Amino acid sequence: MTRRTRSGAAAVLAVLACALPAGSAQAAYHDNVAQATIEQDGGRAFDFAWDIAKQRGGVVDQANKAHAAARCTGCEATAIAFQIVLVSGSPSRVAPTNEAVALNLECAQCEVVAEARQFVRVVDRRVRITSAGRRELADVRATLQALEAQDPPIDQLYLAVEAQEARVRQVLNTELVSRSDPSEEPDPIDAQLAQDTDQG
């Protein structure tokens, strides 16, 4: 899920102002939240949140949130949140949420970007990510974190996030194995995949 605003996007405020009070973000213990708020002219705020959650059964209600807000002149706010949820067994309810909110609060010549990507896999047995998959995800995380220093234009930032999203999908499609299998060879778990939910 993507939310982007530039200067002059005050119309968004009327719809979303209540979603992100200045300086606050409500998060449950298993939520993944990136929040970037800037109120300094010419300033820049960047926040990146990354989470890999695993659970057996129960209620799958993890939330992945990217909140960005700016109230200044010539400033930038960028929030990026990536969350992977691996669920084994038979959950009683599957209702994850993915949310991207970008607020331009009477901001002149500013850019506000929120990017949220959530990946949920429900399988009938316990699985793990192979060593190769973990290395790939570690590189995805580092690549996304590096965007803070690179500070690319909005269009390039979006393409970078999309590219990393594709890499995560590839890992989840090819690098999940049964936890009982000592081999590092990926299992064909398609037959056991009960639910495949990606939001972003």
Q: Residue locations for each model-derived region?
A:
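Low-complexity repeat regions of mature extracellularly deployed or surface/particle-associated proteins
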Residues: 27-200
